[in-house]
Amino acid sequence: MTNLRKTHPLMKIVNSSFIDLPAPSNISSWWNFGSLLGVCLIIQILTGLFLAMHYTSDTMTAFSSVTHICRDVNYGWLIRYLHANGASMFFICLFLHVGRGLYYGSYMYLETWNIGVLLLFAVMATAFMGYVLPWGQMSFWGATVITNLLSAIPYIGSDLVEWIWGGFSVDKATLTRFFAFHFILPFIIAALAGVHLLFLHETGSNNPSGLCSDADKIPFHPYYTIKDILGVLLLILTLTSLVLFSPDLLGDPDNYMPANPLNTPPHIKPEWYFLFAYAILRSIPNKLGGVLALALSILILAVVPFLHTSKQRSMMFRPFSQCLFWILVADLLTLTWIGGQPVEHPFIIIGQLASILYFLLILVIMPITSLFENNLLKW
């Protein structure tokens, strides 16, 4: 008799995705982040659900309801900080996951990669709207500044902004709709993640060497299930340490002041995971130019597969490309630092140089270096 897990209509889907799935025998811990992102999403949906039970999306009571959650709800402080810091862990895993894809040439699976770029946009939109909900000073002014960027779109800009606001400023209508979208988007993200996996399992995983691994596959369970569980334990250890020892480490003190439209904070800045894009936005003195650069800083990922000029897929055996990759990482860290600094000398020029280098590396320097490496190998 055939095993039930191979015949049952529901169980055979799970079986072919997580148990009997043929996986390359040499994938490293950099391949753990997909499953960690799944765990992050589950944590965010669960903690978010419990927060939504006590939160009120009204400008008069939003701030108080968050205070009430932290003070009066059983373990409300824990749920709130798990959710806030869970977002940071989510983005750390996301950036490492994307970095892995860039380093090992996983972007050659076009459908999987494009769904991934779409997922990145969806997660960023969700995080932005979630940051507005506590209705602190940074929530309000962050929402005002970022939504106002859309007014740079020619002809329809100002109408579009008022349509998103639901009025002539960020107010009750804005908060209510942001809460509604913040609630529904994670479920859309979960569905997209399913499609992401579906496309991945059409081709199978890439591996560090970038070579075809059909000749050497091992079953996903028990090898990679155990490996993933180790990753999950480390993720939970990091998250709980952050939540229990320094829950406000990554937050902004300004957000502990209720939103006040009459008082602008001295430095308006988003959460740390948006700072690199924010720095690129600020480095261009023109409003429309800044908005375009902001959008392109993420959209550029969709262009990467078409800029792959190397005869090798992975960077594992390409030392020059490796150097450039780590320069790109250092550049992104520099942009993240600049995004959190005030707009004054020398931060302005550093931000502008780092922004130029970011686009130059991806669009020009890395493709040319790949051609040079092909030449060295007489390919």
Curated annotation (Swiss-Prot):
**GO molecular function terms attached to this record:** metal ion binding; ubiquinol-cytochrome-c reductase activity
Q: Which Gene3D superfamilies match?
A: Cytochrome Bc1 Complex, Chain C
Q: Name one GO cellular component term.
A: mitochondrial inner membrane
Q: Tell me which positions the record assigns to the signal sequence.
A: none
Q: What is the effect of changing residue 295 to V?
A: In strain: Isolate IZEA-2887, Isolate IZEA-3303, Isolate IZEA-3383, Isolate IZEA-IZEA-5326, Isolate IZEA-5339, Isolate IZEA-5381, Isolate IZEA-5561, Isolate IZEA-6137, Isolate JS3032, Isolate JZ665, Isolate JZ835, Isolate San Rhemy and Isolate SI-91.4
Q: Which family does it belong to?
A: Belongs to the cytochrome b family.
Q: What is this protein called?
A: Cytochrome b
The species this protein was found in = Sorex araneus
